[in-house]
C-alpha cells in the first residue's frame, strides 16, 4: 500500500510557557493525501505531559502507549520515562522496526526520543521533527529570537507550523496546538 508520511511536529518552551503543534496531513507514498485531520499531538499523564509523533501512524500509537506506561511506572518523571522507553525501543527486536520519532515535554523539560536510543534535550528550548521539521525549526528559532517579547509559546508554535505548511508538501495547515 505504500509508505505513509505523518508529517511535522514543533515544540517550544518560551517565557515560562510551553506549547506543541502538529499538522493533520497523512500522505501515502509521494502522491496521495489520505487524511487531512490526523491528531499527532496529545496530552498524557493527567494532562501534565505533551507528546507528538512524526512517522508511521500505527507505530506512533504503539509508542504513545508505551511512553504513557513508562510515565506511570516512573511517576511522571519525564527524563527517566524517556530514557527507559528508548532503551526498551532500541533493545527489542520487534520495537526496533517501528518507524517514528517522538517529542515529549512537560513544563520544564523537552526531549526528542528515537528508536536508535537517542534521548536529546535541546539547548534552546525548541524541537521539530518530521518532513517539515527543518522549516518549522528555522521559523521557530527566528520567531523566538526576534519576536520573543510579543509572542506566546502557542503563537510561536502555530506560526512555525504555518510556515512549514507553506513550504513542505507533506505538511498542511490543519494545525493542532496543545499547551501546558
From Swiss-Prot:
Its main location: cytoplasm. PROSITE patterns: PROTEASOME_BETA_2. The keyword Protease applies. InterPro entries: ATP-dep_Prtase_HsIV_su, Ntn_hydrolases_N, Proteasome_sua/b, Proteasome_suB-type. Allosterically activated by HslU binding. It comes from the Bacteria. SUPFAM superfamilies: N-terminal nucleophile aminohydrolases (Ntn hydrolases) (SSF56235). It is an enzyme of class 3 (hydrolase). It is found in: Cytoplasm. Na(+) binds at residues 165, 168, 171. Its EC number is 3.4.25.2. One of its GO terms (molecular function) is metal ion binding. The keyword Protease applies. The active site is at residue 7. HAMAP family: HslV. Protease subunit of a proteasome-like degradation complex believed to be a general protein degrading machinery. NCBIfam families: ATP_dep_HslV, PRK05456.1. Belongs to the peptidase T1B family. HslV subfamily. This is ATP-dependent protease subunit HslV. The gene is hslV.
Amino acid at each position: 500500500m505504500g509508505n505513509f508520511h505523518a508529517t511535522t511536529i514543533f515544540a517550544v518552551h518560551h517565557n515560562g510557557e510551553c506549547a506543541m503543534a502538529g499538522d493533520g496531513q497523512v500522505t501515502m507514498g509521494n502522491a496521495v493525501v489520505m487524511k487531512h485531520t490526523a491528531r499527532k499531538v496529545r496530552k498524557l499523564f493527567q494532562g501534565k505531559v505533551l507528546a507528538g509523533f512524526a512517522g508511521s501512524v500505527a507505530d506512533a500509537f504503539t509508542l504513545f502507549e508505551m511512553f504513557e506506561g513508562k510515565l506511570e511506572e516512573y511517576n511522571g518523571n519525564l527524563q527517566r520515562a524517556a530514557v527507559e522507553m528508548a532503551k526498551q525501543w532500541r533493545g527489542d527486536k520487534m520495537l526496533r522496526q517501528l518507524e517514528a520519532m517522538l517529542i515529549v515535554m512537560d513544563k520544564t523539560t523537552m526531549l526528542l526520543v528515537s528508536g536508535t536510543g537517542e534521548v536529546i534535550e535541546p539547548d534552546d528550548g525548541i524541537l521539530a521533527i518530521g518532513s517539515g521539521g527543518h522549516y518549522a525549526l528555522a521559523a521557530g528559532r527566528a520567531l523566538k529570537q526576534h519576536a520573543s517579547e510579543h509572542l506566546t509559546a502557542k503563537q510561536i508554535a502555530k506560526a512555525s507550523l504555518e510556515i512549514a505548511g507553506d513550504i513542505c508538501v507533506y505538511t498542511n495547515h490543519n494545525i493542532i496546538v496543545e499547551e501546558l
